[in-house]
Structure formats: structure tokens, C-alpha cells
């Protein structure tokens, strides 16, 4: 799968939005992590949103990668928000003990944008 088509990283002012649009392989997850960390460093980013709205299920590698990715981005400074966690994804993350300490969650992208403006 082409990462460019699968995982666009959009910048809107000081916000980065990553919308997953399909299943990613392990190499794609690693590239996404590198690309997002590079984009955070390019310019001052206040918020980074990982939108999982269309992801129904994640394997253990993807769950661990999301935890690592969100922690790495947050350590770089931006407030990290994970949006659109579907029931199957939430179940997998809980079963694997994957938690997102210090990371905000939102029902969907609109809710994430509201959190950025209204806290």
C-alpha cells in the first residue's frame, strides 16, 4: 500500500491532522511515525490529531505503534488528540493494555477541533 495515498498529513495553521484511511503494514506505521515527527519539527505545531474514524480493528503492532507515536509527538510539544476510536479498536487497545496517558481523545474530528478551541 502506498503511504502517500493511505496516510495524508494535513497542516492547517498550527494543527497537523493525520487521517488513517485503510490498513497499514508494519513498514507503513514506521514511516508514518517518522513522517509525523518530521512534520512536527518543521514548524511550530500546537496540536496533532490522529483520526482513526474509519479504522475498525488494529493488530498488536499497530496498537503499540499508536501508543509510541502519540507519546513521541507529545514529547515534542504539541497537544496530541486521538479521534474516532471505534469500539473494535478500543477493545483491542484495552485487551493489549495499551493506554494513552496524557493524550486527549475525541469522538470524531469535529470533537477534536472543538477541544482545541474550547479546551
Please provide the spans of the model-predicted regions.
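Amphipathic alpha-helical interaction surfaces in cytosolic regulatory modules
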Residues: 42-46, 50-99
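STAS-typified acidic loop motif
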Residues: 5-33
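Short, conserved, surface-exposed binding loops centered on an aromatic residue
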Residues: 8-11, 38-42
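Short acidic-hydrophobic, aromatic-tinged amphipathic segments that line or gate anion-handling sites
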Residues: 101-112
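Hydrophobic "anchor" residues on beta-strands that sit immediately upstream
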Residues: 15, 47-49, 104
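Expand to "…catalyze enediolate/carbanion chemistry for C-C bond making/breaking, isomerization
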Residues: 32-41, 77, 110
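Intrinsically disordered or compositionally simple regulatory linkers and C-terminal tails
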Residues: 1-2, 118-119
Amino acid at each position: 500500500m502506498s503511504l502517500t495515498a493511505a496516510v495524508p498529513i494535513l497542516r492547517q495553521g498550527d494543527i497537523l491532522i493525520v487521517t488513517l484511511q485503510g490498513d497499514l503494514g508494519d513498514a507503513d506505521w514506521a514511516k508514518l511515525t517518522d513522517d509525523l515527527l518530521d512534520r512536527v519539527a518543521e514548524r511550530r505545531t500546537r496540536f496533532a490529531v490522529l483520526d482513526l474514524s474509519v479504522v475498525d480493528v488494529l493488530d498488536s503492532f499497530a496498537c503499540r505503534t499508536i501508543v509510541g507515536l502519540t507519546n513521541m509527538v507529545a514529547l515534542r510539544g504539541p497537544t496530541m488528540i486521538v479521534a474516532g476510536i471505534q469500539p473494535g479498536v478500543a477493545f483491542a487497545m484495552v485487551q493489549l493494555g495499551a493506554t494513552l496517558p496524557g493524550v486527549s481523545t475525541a469522538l470524531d474530528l469535529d470533537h477534536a477541533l472543538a477541544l482545541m478551541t474550547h479546551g
